[in-house]
């Protein structure tokens, strides 16, 4: 199968990450995956939701939205409709869950980190790009707390990233564009850590059921892509990457830092 943009079946779209994109937020990036572009910011708030009060633990939460002309046809802002759509709620909860999975909430203390993801151009994979970019914004925000002396270390247990995979015209493909996703018989979003641990899998048989073999092959394809994405994350965060996951390498400091996936 010849892909629209000429990529191989197991090839990611070009990834560009601009760090510190917003001068006000404690952490921010513009992430570009092909033609999909998302601004991700991390903001620190010195309080927690009511259910976390008195626990000594912090919280990571997310909001997600798309600009009206992020898509080919203008979509009204959801605020004008009075409430977020079901899709928006699903995505922002996914982003929050994915990031909380790698944060030591007890070490964070009773603080909330708000992750805001604003899609400025959508060509497939907006939720996975949001997770990948938000991790970098979150890492920078947490590092600022360390630099201010409010935390002893960055409370991140590992890196985390996400990618889409799917079956289009009988072919298993990595990192689907919008057109590929629209034509997919099966599509999956996979979130994994740099240790190869699975955080979340969202898989749907759009054109009917799919076999366990196809599921496992798609998962392997996603793991291949996420390994490459996390390598890029580590390059972007090269000045603080060795401070992430340090609680897992107290005996042998060479273990996790040298891993790329």
UniProtKB/Swiss-Prot annotation:
It catalyses: tRNA(n+1) + phosphate = tRNA(n) + a ribonucleoside 5'-diphosphate. The keyword Zinc does not apply. It comes from the Bacteria. InterPro entries: ExoRNase_PH_dom1, ExoRNase_PH_dom2, ExoRNase_PH_dom2_sf, PNPase/RNase_PH_dom_sf, Ribosomal_Su5_D2-typ_SF, RNase_PH, RNase_PH_bac-type, RNase_PH_CS. Keywords: Nucleotidyltransferase, RNA-binding, rRNA processing, Transferase, tRNA processing, tRNA-binding. The keyword Glycosyltransferase does not apply. GO terms for biological process: rRNA catabolic process; rRNA processing; tRNA processing. Its EC number is 2.7.7.56. It is an enzyme of class 2 (transferase). Phosphate binds at residues 87, 125-127. Homohexameric ring arranged as a trimer of dimers. PANTHER family: EXOSOME COMPLEX COMPONENT (PTHR11953), EXOSOME COMPLEX COMPONENT RRP41 (PTHR11953:SF0). NCBIfam families: RNasePH. Phosphorolytic 3'-5' exoribonuclease that plays an important role in tRNA 3'-end maturation. Removes nucleotide residues following the 3'-CCA terminus of tRNAs; can also add nucleotides to the ends of RNA molecules by using nucleoside diphosphates as substrates, but this may not be physiologically important. Probably plays a role in initiation of 16S rRNA degradation (leading to ribosome degradation) during starvation. Belongs to the RNase PH family. This is Ribonuclease PH. It comes from Caldanaerobacter subterraneus subsp. tengcongensis (strain DSM 15242 / JCM 11007 / NBRC 100824 / MB4).
């Amino acid at each position: 199968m010849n892909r629209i943009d000429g990529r191989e079946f197991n090839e990611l779209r070009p990834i560009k990450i601009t760090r510190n994109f917003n001068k006000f937020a404690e952490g921010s990036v513009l992430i570009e995956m092909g033609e999909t572009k998302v601004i991700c910011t991390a903001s620190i708030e010195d309080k927690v939701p009511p259910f976390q009060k008195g626990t000594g633990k912090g919280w990571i939460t997310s909001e997600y939205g798309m600009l009206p002309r992020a898509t080919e046809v203008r979509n009204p802002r959801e605020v004008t409709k009075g409430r977020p759509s079901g899709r928006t709620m699903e995505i922002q909860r996914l982003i929050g869950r994915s990031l909380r999975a790698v944060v030591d909430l007890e070490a964070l203390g009773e603080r909330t980190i708000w992750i805001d993801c604003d899609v400025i151009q959508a060509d497939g994979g907006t939720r996975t790009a949001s997770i990948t970019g938000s991790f970098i914004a979150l890492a920078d925000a947490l590092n600022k707390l360390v630099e201010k002396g409010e935390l002893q270390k960055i409370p991140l247990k590992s890196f985390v990233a996400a990618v889409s995979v799917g079956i289009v015209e009988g072919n298993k493909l990595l990192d689907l564009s919008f057109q590929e996703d629209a034509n997919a018989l099966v599509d999956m979003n996979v979130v994994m850590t740099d240790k190869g641990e699975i955080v979340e899998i969202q898989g749907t048989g759009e054109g009917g059921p799919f076999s366990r073999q196809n599921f496992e092959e798609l998962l392997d394809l996603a793991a291949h892509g996420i390994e490459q994405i996390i390598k890029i994350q580590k390059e972007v965060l090269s000045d603080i990457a060795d401070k992430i996951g340090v609680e897992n390498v107290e005996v042998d400091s060479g273990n996790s830092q040298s891993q790329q996936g």
